[in-house]
Structures are given as structure tokens and as C-alpha cells.
Amino acid sequence: MKLVIMTKSTFFVEEDKILASLFDEGMDNLHLFKPGSSPMYSERLLTLLPKDFYKKITVHEHYYLNNEYRLGGIHIDNPADIAPKGFKGQLGRTCSDLSMLRQMKKESNYVFLKNIFDCMEFPEEKSNFNLNQLEDAAKAGLIDKKVYALGGMSLERIRIAKALGFGGVVICGDLWNRFDIHNQIDFKELIGHFQ
């Protein structure tokens, strides 16, 4: 099962150091997710990270960064959006509707099935599914190694995702809620949580 870390939706001081430490600890894939932000801030964050990690970074929005920095791919969050014309490379999508999942799997390398549980970072985003629906989707072959669980994922809930047959989990709120970006400067405890 793959572990994907998604950045906090806002930029903060020391973010580059925390991300570099997570890579040093073995993080396989980071999703640079800063919705509605200026691309210059994403560029700045990328320039602060060692180039060795670029192939492990997937970008949401500002898709040109994928080519400019030779990143690991792009991720499309809006189901209605299409890949940039002529795009070649790793492509991921986000889906929140089981009826669309089969088609999205055909059109991408992997799919984040969103709002498995209530979102920790955005409390207004509630779970889209109950356990019975997810079990039925797994039995129907919709949930497999190409589908990653997103939304409310924590270390405790990884077991549920694994039992359902998800190919990976996306951690966001469970990680970033353990660190006060405004007051803490020592992030060793945060890193230790995922060692």
C-alpha cells in the first residue's frame, strides 16, 4: 500500500524543511496542493527543496511546473477538467462519485477517491460514503491498487483502507494538524509520528 502526503493547503514558514525531512525519512510521493495560490509561491517552495526529490512531487494546478522542474506528474482535482493538451506523463485524478470511478481509472494512472471519511483540514467536507458502499465497491472491483483513499485518513484508518483493497492512502490533515504552523519551530515530533 502506497503512502501519499498532501501539503497543507496554505504556505507556511519552515514548510520546505519539514518536507525535506519527510523525504529523508522515506516519503515516496508528495502532492503539492495549494488551491488558488499564485504559482510563484509554489515555484519558491520547489526551489527550496533538493532537486533529488522533484521526481517524487506531483503538482495540483500550475501544471507547467511539472515540465519546468521535471516533477513526478500532475493531478487534476476537478472531474470535469481534462489533461493539458499534449500532456505525457504520470496523471492522477480526484473522484468523489463511485459511478464515475471506473471511467476515471481508465483515463489516469491512479485516482484519489475523495471524502472516505470526514475531512480533517476542511471540516465542511463530510464523508461521501458509508462502509457498506465502500465494501460493495471493493467487491465490484472498483477499489483496487489504482485507487487511493483520501479524506480523514489517519494511522488508525489506514487499516480500514487496506482491508477494503485501496492501493494507497493520502494523508493530509492528520499530519498537519499535529504541528502548529504559527507557533512551533521544532517539527521533530511531527516527523516522528510517521517514522
Identify the role of each PLM range.
Residues 6-9, 18, 28-44, 48-103, ...:
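Catalytic beta/alpha-barrel core
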Residues 74-85, 110-125, 130, 158-194:
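Glycine-rich phosphate-binding active-site loops on the catalytic face of alpha/beta enzymes
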Residues 24, 85-87, 141-142:
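Short, conserved loop/helix-junction motifs that constitute active-site signature segments
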Residues 1-3:
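Extreme N-terminal starter segment of soluble prokaryotic enzymes
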Residues 18-21, 57-72, 76, 96-108, ...:
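Catalytic cores of alpha/beta
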Residues 126-140:
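CoA-thioester-processing core
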Residues 15-17, 42-43, 180-184:
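Conserved strand-to-helix beginnings and helix N-cap segments that scaffold or border functional pockets
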Residues 13, 40, 124-128:
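Residues at secondary-structure transition points
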